[in-house]
């Protein structure tokens, strides 16, 4: 089929994507000269939108390079990389390995693990596309979302595998709910050939002790941290054993063949991590905002965290609501297939700590007027 035919099909299905040109303005974005409250950003703590930490960092670290100019295997890794990895290792009591993005990390590490013979992946139905892309050419099965009984049935019928790697996200970015980590850890104790792979992309910085995530210091074999959301930087890190780190250094193609992160971003991520323990008030405010929006929208909304989903179940309806909200001063993009199942299409809302209660009052009023 020709490209244009495929694009025409997407348009018929109200599923055609276009890139929009915005200008960031704190908790707002400017689009077509209109100032919109931004519900699309993953800047959950408001660090990026405030700019305060960024200014403090730039005043202190003035001589960081803007380019690594090589992969880490070929000399693209100076002191900044090792210092940050050592810092993360001291926090998480395990080894740390930096990658250029969360997508690249998941794709590369899972593709590498897939080369291990007699290994099976069991992935939650709602895991991120980067995880699916990493395991799709391997032995894998999917279990019903957050359904421990369904997962255990799969385990019991596949115990002949030498290793079974269970994959989940600690906080799911579309369903806006949490993985049952404690129950998964119980399964790991029960079945000795299980390993756990947990993506903390949407929880790191904003949840857990000192914002260090929901899997912090738990018996998780592969813990994924990403820095482009609450950390307000870019890149990602794998927290794992020394053996696994050495394996990824040698087998994770996205690490071997990609230019390393810019040193200035590595240093900035390290700087933000060193401040996370100071952000308890921001995290508390974020949770209060989350609870307040649930009260305002009641049965119209799902999500127990700062990520919310207004499920509309139809691409056209989702686009309609998104456009109407934009007219009323809110940027809340529609989420459609294949990102979510057709029945789950709707409006995704990301709250951040730079918002206040009146922002949510205004949003709820606008939503009910549509």
Segments predicted by a language model, with ranges:
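N-terminal "arm"/small-domain region of PLP-dependent enzymes with the aminotransferase-like
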Residues: 2-5, 9-66, 162, 194
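PLP-dependent enzyme catalytic core of the Aspartate aminotransferase-like
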Residues: 50-51, 55-59, 63, 86, ...
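Conserved N-terminal alpha-helix of the aminotransferase class I/II PLP-enzyme fold
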Residues: 55-102, 290
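Conserved PLP-anchoring active-site segment centered on the Schiff-base-forming lysine
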Residues: 109-129, 152
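Active-site phosphate-binding strand-loop segment of PLP-dependent enzymes
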Residues: 145-198
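Active-site PLP attachment segment
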Residues: 216-247
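Structural motif of enzymes handling amino- and sulfur-group chemistry
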Residues: 260-279, 285, 289, 294
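Conserved PLP-binding catalytic core of the aspartate aminotransferase-like
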Residues: 284-329, 339, 351-353
């Amino acid at each position: 089929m020709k490209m244009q035919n495929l694009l025409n099909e997407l348009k018929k299905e109200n599923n055609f994507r276009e890139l929009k040109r915005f200008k960031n303005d704190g908790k707002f974005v400017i689009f077509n000269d209109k100032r919109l409250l931004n519900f699309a950003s993953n800047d959950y703590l408001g660090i990026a939108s405030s700019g305060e930490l960024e200014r403090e960092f730039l005043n202190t670290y003035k001589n960081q390079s803007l380019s690594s100019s090589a992969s880490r295997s070929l000399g693209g890794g100076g002191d900044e990389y090792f210092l940050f990895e050592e810092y993360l290792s001291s926090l998480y009591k395990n080894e740390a390995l930096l990658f250029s993005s969360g997508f690249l990390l998941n794709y590369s590490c899972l593709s590498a693990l897939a080369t291990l013979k007699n290994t099976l992946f069991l992935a939650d139905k709602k895991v991120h596309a980067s995880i699916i892309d990493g395991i799709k050419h391997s032995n894998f099965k999917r279990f019903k979302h957050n359904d421990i009984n369904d997962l255990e049935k799969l385990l019991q019928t596949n115990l002949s595998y030498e290793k079974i790697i269970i994959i989940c996200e600690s906080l799911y970015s579309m369903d806006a709910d949490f993985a049952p980590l404690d129950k998964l850890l119980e399964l790991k104790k029960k079945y000795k050939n299980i390993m756990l792979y947990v993506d903390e992309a949407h929880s790191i910085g904003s949840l857990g002790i000192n914002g260090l995530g929901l899997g912090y210091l738990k018996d998780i074999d592969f813990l994924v941290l990403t820095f482009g959301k609450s950390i307000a930087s870019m890149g990602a890190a794998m927290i794992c054993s020394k053996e696994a780190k050495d394996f990824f250094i040698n087998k994770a193609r996205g690490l071997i063949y990609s230019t390393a992160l810019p040193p200035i971003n590595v240093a900035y991520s390290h700087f933000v991590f060193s401040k996370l323990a100071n952000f308890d008030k921001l995290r508390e405010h974020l949770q209060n905002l989350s609870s307040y929006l649930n009260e305002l929208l009641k049965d119209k909304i799902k999500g127990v965290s700062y990520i919310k989903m207004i499920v509309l179940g139809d691409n056209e309806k989702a686009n309609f609501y998104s456009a109407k909200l934009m007219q009323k001063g809110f940027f809340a993009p529609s989420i459609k297939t294949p990102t979510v199942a057709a029945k789950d299409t709707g409006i995704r809302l990301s709250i951040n700590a730079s918002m206040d209660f009146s922002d949510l009052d205004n949003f709820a009023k606008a939503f009910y007027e549509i």
